[in-house]
A protein has these predicted regions:
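A short beta-strand-turn-helix
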Residues: 1-20, 41
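Amphipathic coiled-coil/heptad-repeat helices and related helical stalk/stem segments
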Residues: 35, 97-100, 128
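Non-catalytic, surface beta->alpha helical segment in thiol-disulfide oxidoreductase systems
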Residues: 106, 116-141
């Protein structure tokens, strides 16, 4: 986890943010949207969301990821996109989307969503809040 380029992720802090996890997520993935609603229920957590478009499945996901990254408020733009499916207006800026794709491939992430704990544990799929809480406890042992 310490080797993740956290500057290439969208950072969201809830509560004190003492628990840390990374999420690889595709903006057009229905399971990612389901996970996002579960992550919204977590407290005392810092989330690093790496936009990870799976272009073979979702051909518009890359452009949406870039639009979110280039938005004035990335966290708000991501939340809006995941809740409503509405992407922000397209803009151009330097973005990490290609690096995120390469990073995910290097880490062996084959599907979205995928969670990574600060201790290197992986939880694939759209788990409910209770499962994520349990996983965070186990990951810290």
């Amino acid at each position: 986890f310490g080797e993740l380029p956290l500057a290439d992720a969208i950072k969201i802090v809830r509560g004190k943010g003492e628990r840390v996890l990374a999420v690889f997520s595709d903006p057009d993935c229905p399971y990612c949207r389901r996970l996002e609603s579960e992550l919204d229920k977590l407290d005392n957590v810092t989330l690093y969301t790496f936009p990870y478009p799976l272009e073979g499945l979702h051909p518009e996901a890359r452009d949406k990821s870039i639009a979110v990254w280039c938005a004035a408020n990335r966290a708000q733009a991501w939340a809006e996109l995941m809740k409503s499916g509405k992407a922000p207006a397209s803009r151009k800026c330097d973005h990490p989307i290609e690096r995120n794709i390469q990073l995910g491939q290097r880490l062996g992430i084959q599907g979205t969503p995928t969670l990574l704990s600060a201790y290197g544990r992986i939880l694939p799929g759209a788990a409910p809040k209770e499962r994520i809480e349990q996983w965070l406890l186990e990951a810290g042992r």
